Amino acid sequence: MAKRGHEHENIIVSSIFREGGKMKNPVSLPLLALLGVLCSLASVLLAPPAQCAELPQKDSQLPPFELPAPSAEIDQQYLGVKPPAFAPKDVAGQVLLVEILGVYCPLCYQQAPLFNKLYGRIQKKSLGDRVKMLGIAIGATTVEVEHLRKSGSYEYPIVRDESFVVHKLLGEPRTPFTMLLSKDGKVLHTHLGVIEDIDAFFPLIQALAK
């Protein structure tokens, strides 16, 4: 009886792959069930990730959020913020340039020297009090952020978004993603990807900071 029961569990599905009334490549029910489970898992795993929000657009209002204050006192003074945390509206100046970046993002490293040049130009053109620059490193730890600053890769302050909270609020943009914000959190300009022409970008910042 046990043998007959075992044979019953492995009934051959003869309606699949028939040729001339004879079975071709017989498939057992347990195998079909397994294939069904695998297909279901694949449909879930391969589905595109859902974004929590849309990317910020020009003239939209940025959702409220806080960031950990930079550990270096010189960066705190530059931004005009104090530990433990601050909101974008707390930053000194009229215009805040926010760069969403990744610690291991190749395009971010491509943009870094361009933005360092932009940072220097802002200081030289006496815009330093009106325009501030801030990098937000998504998924980064304190150690990784401190390494970025100490290595000289970034001359402006970088803070971490270790748990991706801000990244999700902003619609999970690819990196780098740049925003120009007003004091009250209004989005003045956005750019997804590397800003290669700093000479063309700088006049826009000047105009917004008047």
Would you name each region that the model predicts?
Residues L148-Y154, E162-I205:
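Thiol/disulfide oxidoreductase modules built on the thioredoxin-like
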Residues A92, I100-K117:
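Conserved redox-active cysteine motifs that mediate thiol-disulfide chemistry
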Residues L97-V98, M133:
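Hydrophobic beta-strand anchors of alpha/beta hydrolase catalytic cores
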Residues Y109-G152, V165-H167:
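Structural microenvironment flanking redox-active thiols in thiol-disulfide oxidoreductases
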Residues L46-Y78:
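N-proximal helix/coil linker or "cap" segments that precede and/or mark the start of modular domains
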Residues L67-L96:
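A short beta-strand-turn-helix
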Residues L32-A47:
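Bacterial N-terminal signal peptides
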Residues R4-K22:
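Short, Lys/Arg-enriched N-terminal segments with co-localized hydrophobic residues
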